Amino acid sequence: MKAAIEEAETGVREGGIPIGSVLVHRTRIIGRGHNRRIQKNSVILHGEMDALENAGRQPASVYRECVIYTTLSPCAMCSGAILLYGIPKVVIGENQTFRGEEDLLRSHGVLVEVVQDQACIRMMSNFIRANPKLWNEDIGEI
């Protein structure tokens, strides 16, 4: 989770949304990413999508042995990618500021662990308070 938090902090420094993610195969990080929708003027570069992209093409067998760590509960798009690639476990930093598709993931057999990390909660709460319009755009509310 520490590496995912570092990615989220990088996103904030770049003027973006503080959501970070890492894809871990066995014990090695193979992909790191953070939400770069603002920085890249992208509609899809959420933290999890960026981590998957930065992992590069992998055989399906690799994804089936991975854990994806994300600082915030994954949205429908990111959850869909997790399901598509057969990632069996998701560790979520927090789901108090946004609860994504955890039930969908669980219904497909994905092990979902929510740790309610105080740094993740604080980072998102501060961002949402300071940037409500950007946040609502990111989650598809406006």
What does each of the following model-derived ranges do?
Residues 4, 8-11, 47, 51-55:
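Stable alpha-helical structural segments in soluble proteins, enriched in small hydrophobic residues
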Residues 19-27:
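Short beta-strand scaffold segments in enzyme catalytic cores
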Residues 48-72:
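Mobile, glycine- and charge-enriched loop segments
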